[in-house]
């Protein structure tokens, strides 16, 4: 199990309930400016989730989610590789690679499977053209955000990994939101893991003549467990993403009547 630190527990449940995060309230009251120079830190953490200046927190959260996935694969007897992941030329012409290789899973006509993880925030926090969208839902249907991210990852990686020279790979996007919603492809992977774990369990107990009902019951238990384990890992990751490092802050926000072409819409050129 992934350990909860007291401040992470507090941060996650404040975000779940939609109330200000205690560690961010003082920064918001002081008007502390993010290192991006475009926004002040809000007490709900929406900008921190959205701004690329907080990549340290984002990377820690990303690794936490991968840790949870690797633990589930281990329980199912699936070996994984997190280093030296093959790279491909993405659809946008840039070189990229997935996050984790699942070895010898034999899916979609390929021996190995590569997954790429993403954790979407459902609220705006980095809008400049219309700042009223910050703190509001990014889409009326949150599932659209998951679908858009998954489609982007599939377009970038699936064909490249399937048609590369040498060893080819299947590809699955593993996308979920900070509220805990999971994209269908992520659930598909968790079902595959639950199925493999069930097969392994009956093999370990030496039961080669189990009924279909017994198999489905055990698989249902493991599927529930995999979803709960990923939900727990995601909760810890969400709390980690809302953390503010000292180097990501600037000076307190200046009085509204002061002129600062970098920070305030009133002085930003119309084409910004």
PLM regions: where:
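Non-catalytic C-terminal interaction segments of nucleic acid-processing enzymes
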Residues: 1-32, 37, 57, 71, ...
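Short, conserved catalytic/metal-binding micro-motifs enriched in Asp/Glu and His
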Residues: 45-51, 99, 115, 173
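Inter-domain linker/hinge segments that demarcate the starts of reverse transcriptase
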Residues: 63-77
């Amino acid at each position: 199990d992934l350990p909860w630190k007291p401040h992470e527990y507090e941060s996650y449940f404040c975000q779940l309930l939609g109330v200000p995060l205690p560690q961010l309230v003082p920064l918001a009251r002081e008007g502390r400016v993010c290192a991006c120079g475009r926004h002040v830190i809000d007490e709900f953490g929406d900008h921190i989730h959205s701004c690329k200046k907080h990549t340290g927190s984002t990377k820690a959260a990303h690794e936490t989610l991968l840790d949870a996935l690797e633990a589930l694969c281990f329980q199912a007897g699936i070996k994984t590789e997190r280093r030296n992941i093959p790279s491909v030329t993405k659809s946008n012409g840039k070189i990229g690679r997935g996050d984790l290789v699942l070895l010898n899973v034999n899916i979609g006509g390929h021996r190995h499977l590569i997954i790429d993880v993403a954790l979407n925030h459902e609220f705006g926090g980095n809008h400049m053209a219309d700042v009223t969208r910050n703190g509001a839902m990014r889409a009326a249907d949150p599932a659209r955000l998951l679908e858009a991210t998954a489609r982007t990852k599939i377009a970038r990686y699936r064909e490249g990994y399937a048609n590369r020279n040498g060893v080819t790979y299947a590809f699955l996007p593993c996308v979920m939101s900070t509220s805990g919603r999971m994209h269908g492809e992520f659930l598909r992977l968790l079902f595959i893991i639950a199925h493999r774990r069930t097969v392994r369990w009956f093999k370990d107990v030496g039961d080669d003549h189990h009924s279909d009902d017994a198999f489905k019951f055990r698989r249902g238990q493991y599927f529930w467990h995999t979803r709960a384990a990923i939900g727990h890992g995601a909760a810890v990751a969400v709390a980690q993403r809302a953390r503010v490092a000292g180097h990501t802050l600037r000076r307190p926000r200046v009085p509204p009547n002061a002129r600062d072409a970098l920070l305030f819409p009133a002085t930003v050129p119309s084409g910004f």
